[in-house]
Structure formats: structure tokens, C-alpha cells
């Protein structure tokens, strides 16, 4: 996995060193970043879409959950979202001072994948462990992948703004895919199938 992913990052480095392959007229590295972000957002929003439903579903029946009250589920959901965005700060510091941005994104993608697959294990005790992995991984990936997009362009390059526009389109596409795929599987086959689909999506993103 690491070798495949580093081949993609090598494409980014080659463009930075003025290899002029393009993606819709933009640096070819934007393709790798676009697809990685798209699948990460698919996994993130797909899991979010079924998270509260899983927590509030009863422990018995054809699609059992954790049987939390609505208040408990909403509190956990809110804490999770808050921690995801808070961890971008230490994730950025680690990338700037220790790992570098590319290694931070790689590590984040792998940790997020582990988190979703941990959620997919049909054991109640793995739920919070899976959330912890996703929080940590997203902190490493989320802010740093945007930084790499900026590195594809010179400071005064007029294409930079449109490059970011293309990149941010991946968020919208990924969120729609997440709600359709993870939400559909979660409600029709079982919540853990939805979590597993999120993990599979992030695994695809890690291979870009």
C-alpha cells in the first residue's frame, strides 16, 4: 500500500519540479489530491449520516444498534464533530514540524481507514475506538492535503484559485457518494455494512 501511495505522491513532486503533465489544464498532482479528498469525504459524510441512527437503534431487531437515548447520541455526535475539527490544529503542527505534509496525509488516510473498519466490527466495544481512530486520522489529513494543493502552483499563478475550486468539488461529490452508498447499505443491510463501505472508500482514497 505504501509503495502505491508514494508513487502517486511522486507525481506531485515531479510536477513541483516542473514536469508538465496536466489534469484539466492543472498540475497532474491535483488528480491524486482530488480523488484522495473525494473518497475521504465519502467515508466521513457516509459514516456521519448513519452514526446517530446506529446509536439510537434498539439492541434487538433486524438492524440493531446501541440503544442510546437521543440526548446521549447527539452529545456524542457533537463531541465527535468538535474533536475532528479541533485535531486539525495539532495535525498541522505535526506536519509542519515533524512528519511533513505528504507523510501526514498518508498516515491520516491509513488511520481513518482503520477507524472505519473498526466501526464495521459488529461489537459494541469497538465503536468508540473506531471514532478515536477517525478523529486522529482526520486531524492529520484534512488541513494538510489542502496545503499540498497550494504547493502545486507558484505564488502568483492565476490558476491556483481555479485549482482549489476543482479540489473543493471533490468534497461535494464525496459527500453525495457517502450518503448514497453508506446510508443505503447501512439502512438496508445493517449499520456495520455502511461503516465497512466508508472504510472501503477511504482505502480507495489511500491508494490514489
Where are the predicted features?
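Short amphipathic helix-loop junctions that connect adjacent transmembrane helices
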Residues: 50-72
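Conserved MFS/SLC helix-loop-helix module at the cytosolic interface between two early adjacent transmembrane helices
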Residues: 89-110
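Symmetry-related core transmembrane helices of the 12-TM Major Facilitator Superfamily/SLC fold
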Residues: 193-208
Amino acid at each position: 500500500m505504501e509503495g502505491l501511495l508514494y508513487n502517486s505522491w511522486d507525481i506531485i513532486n515531479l510536477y513541483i519540479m516542473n514536469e508538465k503533465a496536466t489534469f484539466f489544464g492543472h498540475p497532474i498532482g491535483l488528480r491524486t489530491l482530488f480523488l484522495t479528498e473525494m473518497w475521504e469525504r465519502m467515508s466521513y459524510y457516509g459514516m456521519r449520516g448513519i452514526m446517530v441512527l446506529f446509536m439510537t437503534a434498539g439492541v434487538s431487531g433486524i438492524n440493531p444498534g446501541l440503544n442510546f437515548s437521543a440526548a446521549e447520541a447527539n452529545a456524542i455526535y457533537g463531541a465527535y464533530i468538535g474533536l475532528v475539527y479541533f485535531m486539525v490544529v495539532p495535525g498541522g503542527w505535526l506536519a509542519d514540524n515533524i512528519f511533513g505534509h505528504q507523510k501526514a496525509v498518508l498516515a491520516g488516510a491509513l488511520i481513518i481507514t482503520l477507524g472505519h473498519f473498526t466501526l464495521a466490527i459488529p461489537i459494541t466495544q469497538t465503536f468508540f475506538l473506531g471514532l478515536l481512530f477517525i478523529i486522529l486520522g482526520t486531524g492529520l489529513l484534512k488541513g494538510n492535503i489542502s496545503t499540498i494543493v497550494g504547493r502545486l502552483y507558484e505564488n502568483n499563478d492565476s490558476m491556483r484559485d481555479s485549482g482549489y475550486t476543482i479540489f473543493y468539488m471533490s468534497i461535494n461529490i464525496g459527500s453525495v457518494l457517502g450518503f448514497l452508498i453508506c446510508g443505503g447499505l447501512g439502512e438496508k443491510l445493517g449499520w456495520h455494512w455502511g461503516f465497512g463501505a466508508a472504510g472501503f472508500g477511504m482505502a480507495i482514497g489511500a491508494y490514489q
